[in-house]
Amino acid sequence: MSLHRVLSIYTRAGVTATASPFFSGRVADRASNMAAHNFVPFITNKREKSSGVGLSALAAKKPRVPRQSDSKKPSLVIFDKDGTLICFHSMWVPWTKQTTLKLNEAANLDISHKFYKLLGFCPVEQKVKTGLLAEGTMEQIRQRVVELLVESEVPRASAEQIVHSSVLDCNTSSPETLKQIHDLQGLFKELKTHNVKVAICTADSRKGTMNALQSLGLEKYVDLVVCGDDDGSLPKPHPHNALSICRVLGVDPEDALMVGDTLADMGMGRSANLGTVGVLSGVGDRHELHPHADHLVKHVGELMPLLLGSTQNNQNNMPSTN
């Protein structure tokens, strides 16, 4: 599904939001109002979309500045998926190992070490660190693996075929690998009780994302989903997707919150002028996220007290869990 198509849906006569799986009924009801306000989608840059270099560095460029609305309950929370809602390691470590075996066999080379380094996977700790796998889209990963094979003297045409057959989407619906970090249905229900909209912005594919949400019974609670392979999507930390979500849902970025586990998540939120909450349940650790998040929490289960102001989860006095 095209993000550009979804975002431009309000400017095309005779088309309603119910035609898109992005939307729940609540959002569909707003379609006519959005059209009346001449909603125009953002213009995207394909070259910028394909660039996957230095995501963490980009995210870390801009120092965190306190916002006037930090103490106000948000109208919208945008969640990253893997590492924030779903255990990153239980899903992507098996994928990394299986993909490595496929690449080695197809290329008749042992590129395990290079592939692990490219992705940010530590075979000793059996964990994914900050890097391409944690922050990039599948398109970016495939492009970089092609270049890795070419650098290993594999002809480009062969490298592209190897990647096409070996670097496949992750099976995100398997109960063996799909492990939610918290009671997500309970969390999303509580957000809805307090009239807070819910969106998900992930680098993962749409197929994998929707499979995961359906397996966990979450799709009915989510107002908008933006994925890495949606046409018109730009990778984090670019602010495009966050600003697009805010526009579609009719929320001022100042009244929205980005929740994620990587510098790319924090960078997207900050560059779009959203509040930012870093979670220590995924790839990023306290030392990475601390300078760039308005708040740090151990996991999304600690989010509601923070949003409602019943406890003060100050990032400067919270102990690290890493």
Language-model regions, residue ranges each:
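Glycine- and other small-residue-rich loops at beta-strand/loop junctions that grip anionic moieties
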Residues: 176, 201, 234
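Conserved phosphate-coupling serine/threonine residues in phosphotransfer and NTP-handling enzymes
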Residues: 84, 202-204
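Asp-based, Mg2+/Mn2+-dependent phosphohydrolase catalytic module
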Residues: 2-9, 23-76, 185, 189-190, ...
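Long, low-complexity intrinsically disordered regions in eukaryotic nuclear regulators
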Residues: 16-17, 21
